[in-house]
Amino acid sequence: MAKSKGARIVVTLECRSAEGVYRYTTTKNRRNNPNKMELKKYCPLSKKHEVFKEIK
């Protein structure tokens, strides 16, 4: 039998102020967080904490 997929997946977070320039990768549990994730992380381009949103 095939093993079922795990709940954890790798997602990419992209800065909203500098789109397409700076990204982070992290993991999330798709059962607990089915919606797109948003985190405040440090953006070295703007040199401050910005909102990073999950991209597909």
Curated annotation (Swiss-Prot):
Listed name of the protein: Large ribosomal subunit protein bL33c
UniProt similarity note: Belongs to the bacterial ribosomal protein bL33 family.
PROSITE patterns found in the cross-reference section: RIBOSOMAL_L33
Subcellular location: Plastid, Chloroplast
Keywords: Chloroplast, Plastid, Ribonucleoprotein, Ribosomal protein
Sections of the chain in a coiled coil: none
Chief site of localization: plastid
InterPro entries for the chain: Ribosomal_bL33, Ribosomal_bL33_CS, Ribosomal_bL33_sf, Ribosomal_zn-bd
GO cellular component term of the entry, any: ribosome
GO molecular function term, any single one: structural constituent of ribosome
Pfam families per UniProt: Ribosomal_L33
GO-annotated biological processes: translation
Record gene name: rpl33
Organism of this sequence: Rhodomonas salina
Disulfide bond is among the record's keywords: no
